[in-house]
């Protein structure tokens, strides 16, 4: 992605103050998303590692691929933040690292429904986050970021639907949805052998397990 230009108000923009506000909101959302992707990736790593039984090998493989895409999104968001002259918030990095490790560990001791429901709910929140980022990018004149945001939104949407498909008929879903609010969206096309993810997966992730910068997996130093 190209460095963020200094823009003047265009047809979809307001005053210069409005543009500055939308740029600030765009950055704020992406800072939250950057750390949120860390929590998601670490939680998914614990999740797929907990699925050691042979009859869950297909689910295990897909969650492993989804983890890889979360790391990819984190790298892409990090690039945008750098181009905007910003970066991650250390306190949020520490918090989300802890959240990801905690929920990843819970997958080894809890049942099957809970982690899948939580993953779908998380992916739904990610969809909304990237959609809102796109709104602010457009209003701030940062249209060159829209294609990347659209791709990440579509990928997160596919993740949400894939997780939702797994629990759509589970007897606990109606009660859980009433209590926690998230209900799976309509299912993906079941004729797609890869659950609808293949046409959105970056080429460098095809056929690969989850890959992350080793530095990203280490607990962030809150003093830095």
Model segments located where?
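Non-heme di-metal
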Residues: 1-224
